[in-house]
């Protein structure tokens, strides 16, 4: 599966199939959330949250790819990510793009 953030695939002719998307809501456990709260007092990267967001992006992307595959797509173009805070310590990641067939 080819994944690109452009609205084309260089050197390829494509046929649009459909919008595809994937999403997930992730949260950290209380212990890691507490330690991250302490880290905000001294500054620096909140590694527990960075890991949470990386995992969420991967899950959402995999869900989008599975939807594209189910439609017979060879690629997803024009991919975009969006995030939002759901509550303290939890975030939603949404990824969407256009499923296409390479001709």
From Swiss-Prot:
This chain belongs to the protein called: UPF0145 protein NT01CX_0170
What is the residue range of the signal peptide feature? none
Which InterPro entries does this one have? Answer: UPF0145_dom_sf, UPF0145_YbjQ-like
Q: Which domain of life is it from?
A: Bacteria
**Family annotation (Pfam families):** YbjQ_1
Record family assignment: Belongs to the UPF0145 family.
């Amino acid at each position: 599966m080819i994944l690109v953030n452009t609205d084309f695939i260089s050197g390829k002719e494509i046929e649009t199939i459909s919008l595809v998307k994937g999403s997930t809501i992730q949260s950290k456990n209380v212990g890691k959330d507490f330690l991250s709260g302490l880290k905000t007092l001294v500054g620096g990267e909140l590694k527990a949250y960075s890991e949470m967001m990386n995992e969420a992006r991967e899950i959402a992307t995999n869900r989008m790819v599975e939807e594209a595959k189910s439609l017979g797509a060879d690629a997803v173009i024009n991919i975009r990510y969006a995030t939002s805070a759901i509550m303290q310590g939890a975030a939603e990641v949404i990824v969407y793009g256009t499923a296409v067939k390479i001709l």
